[in-house]
């Protein structure tokens, strides 16, 4: 959420940022309501001053043994006016809050302006896509042929975009999770968190999923509870409504979780395989930093996610998202895209974003720069470190052999109990 004072003082700057995103949100209603609120606050303050004066006059009259009924009646009328005015102000503030919650973050000046993913800018590549001497299979065929993935029974038991991992498939998924957590905690300084997979509405509001993206969430019927779409939600909200000490920052957390997404807008996209599931596993990286350090932290976070792909030997590229492709809450985002032979293209496997104080303001997460200073909002960042199912897909496709077997990446062999090859 943007600072109300910033929007009030810089409407042209906010509108320019919205225009870069391709948003047609108008600030007219916001500015009108904000002006109305400030006018009513002045009137309310005047009425409260009047009430104080009348109250003092009543006290003097009673002390002197004189009739104070007229003044008492006057104070009741003033008190009612104050109540009515406070109610009006509260209603206006609710409308202002609703508008502020609907406004996306303002893109950082370093973000390329564009309409969509076609305007993203490639920053760098790592590794070279493998040249196969045979026709490579897609991961869904490989998984079913090896009896380690079962999409048909996933559909039977639950529905479309659900799957079973079996045998070596389940073991490889678990190996990836443990490897990622070990690398981030041992080499990158993250503290592991194992969060709840169900959160309340306030948590979803804090990280920006609500109210705008309610249709993409799985909500528990009749309850103010949601299945998490990413561990970003519970881990960021870990410090909701708290004031951190300056020496605590930066805070690095990593978390494994299952993720649940309705994917309401993804009909017809990536219908086969593990690329777009309603339930999938992910290791998430979350940071809380001082404002002046957040962009340096974004570069480090992105490098941390890249390290996973490098260790797995998977070719990938880093792209800087354009204003038209960025998420609602982000001020700047890098996507890591892994090479998938079945698509003959790079596919997203991680998004690393700096939200500035956008989430912290919604979730009320602050820090105190000095022991006696006024609390300020922290900056929050997160990124996938990385999406586990997509990593498994990339391993199956990039490490497949002509006989249909899969070579296990060397770094995962210890996590697989010494198994170096997955065969039928």
From Swiss-Prot:
Gene: serS
Pfam families referenced in this protein's UniProt entry, alphabetically: Seryl_tRNA_N, tRNA-synt_2b
Cross-referenced InterPro entries: aa-tRNA-synt_IIb, aa-tRNA-synth_II, aa-tRNA-synth_II/BPL/LPL, Ser-tRNA-ligase_type_1, Ser-tRNA-synth_1_N, SerRS_1_N_sf, SerRS_core, tRNA-bd_arm
Note on domains (UniProt): Consists of two distinct domains, a catalytic core and a N-terminal extension that is involved in tRNA binding.
Binding site for ATP: 261-263, 348-351
Organism: Desulforamulus reducens (strain ATCC BAA-1160 / DSM 100696 / MI-1) (Desulfotomaculum reducens)
Subcellular location(s) of the protein: Cytoplasm
Keyword Methyltransferase: no
Catalysis performed (reactions): tRNA(Ser) + L-serine + ATP = L-seryl-tRNA(Ser) + AMP + diphosphate + H(+); tRNA(Sec) + L-serine + ATP = L-seryl-tRNA(Sec) + AMP + diphosphate + H(+)
Binding positions for L-serine per the UniProt entry: 230-232, 284, 384
Complex and partners: Homodimer. The tRNA molecule binds across the dimer.
NCBIfam families: serS
Official protein name in the record: Serine--tRNA ligase
Family: Belongs to the class-II aminoacyl-tRNA synthetase family. Type-1 seryl-tRNA synthetase subfamily.
GO terms of molecular function: ATP binding; catalytic activity, acting on a protein; serine-tRNA ligase activity; transferase activity
One Gene Ontology cellular component annotation held by this UniProt entry: cytoplasm
Example of a GO biological process term: seryl-tRNA aminoacylation
EC number: 6.1.1.11
Entry-linked Gene3D superfamilies: Bira Bifunctional Protein, Domain 2, Serine-tRNA synthetase, tRNA binding domain
High-level lineage: Bacteria, Bacillati, Bacillota, Clostridia, Eubacteriales
Keywords for this protein: Aminoacyl-tRNA synthetase, ATP-binding, Cytoplasm, Ligase, Nucleotide-binding, Protein biosynthesis
Role according to the record: Catalyzes the attachment of serine to tRNA(Ser). Is also able to aminoacylate tRNA(Sec) with serine, to form the misacylated tRNA L-seryl-tRNA(Sec), which will be further converted into selenocysteinyl-tRNA(Sec).
Aminoacyl-tRNA synthetase as UniProt keyword: yes
């Amino acid at each position: 959420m943007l600072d109300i004072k910033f929007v009030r003082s810089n409407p042209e700057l906010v509108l320019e940022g919205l225009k870069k995103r391709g948003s047609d949100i108008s600030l007219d209603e916001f500015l009108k309501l904000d002006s109305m609120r400030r006018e009513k606050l002045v009137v309310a303050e005047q009425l409260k001053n009047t009430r104080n004066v009348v109250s003092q006059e009543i006290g003097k009259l009673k002390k002197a043994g004189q009739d104070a009924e007229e003044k008492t009646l006057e104070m009741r009328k003033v008190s009612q006016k104050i109540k009515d005015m406070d109610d009006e102000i509260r209603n206006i503030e609710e409308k202002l809050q609703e508008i502020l919650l609907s406004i996306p973050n303002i893109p950082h000046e370093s973000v390329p302006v564009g309409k969509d993913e076609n305007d993203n800018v490639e920053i760098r590549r790592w590794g070279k896509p493998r040249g196969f001497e045979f026709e490579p299979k897609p991961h869904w065929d490989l998984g079913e042929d090896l009896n380690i993935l079962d999409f048909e029974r996933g559909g039977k038991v639950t529905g479309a975009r659900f799957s079973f991992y079996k045998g070596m498939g389940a073991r490889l998924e678990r190996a990836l999770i443990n490897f990622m957590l070990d690398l981030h905690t041992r080499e990158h300084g993250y503290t592991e968190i194992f969060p709840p997979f169900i959160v309340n509405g306030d948590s979803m509001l804090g990280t920006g999923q609500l109210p705008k993206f309610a249709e993409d969430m799985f909500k528990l019927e009749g309850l103010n509870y949601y299945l998490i779409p990413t561990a970003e939600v519970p881990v960021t909200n870990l410090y909701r409504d708290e004031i951190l000490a300056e020496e605590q920052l930066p805070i690095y957390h990593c978390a494994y979780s299952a993720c649940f997404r309705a994917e309401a807008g993804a009909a017809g996209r990536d219908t086969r395989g593990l690329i777009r599931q309603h339930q999938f596993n992910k290791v998430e990286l979350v940071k809380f930093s001082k404002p002046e350090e957040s962009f340096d932290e974004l570069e480090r976070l992105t490098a941390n996610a890249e390290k996973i792909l490098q260790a797995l030997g998977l070719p990938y590229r880093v792209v800087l998202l354009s204003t038209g492709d960025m998420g609602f809450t982000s001020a700047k985002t890098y996507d890591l895209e892994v090479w998938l032979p079945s698509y003959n293209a790079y596919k997203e496997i991680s998004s690393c974003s700096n939200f500035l104080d956008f989430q912290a303001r919604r979730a009320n997460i602050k820090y105190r720069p000095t022991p006696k200073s006024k609390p300020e909002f922290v900056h929050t960042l997160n990124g996938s470190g990385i999406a586990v199912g997509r990593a498994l897909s990339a391993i199956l496709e990039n490490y497949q052999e002509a006989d249909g077997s899969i070579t296990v990446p060397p770094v995962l062999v210890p996590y697989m109990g010494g198994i170096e090859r997955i065969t039928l």
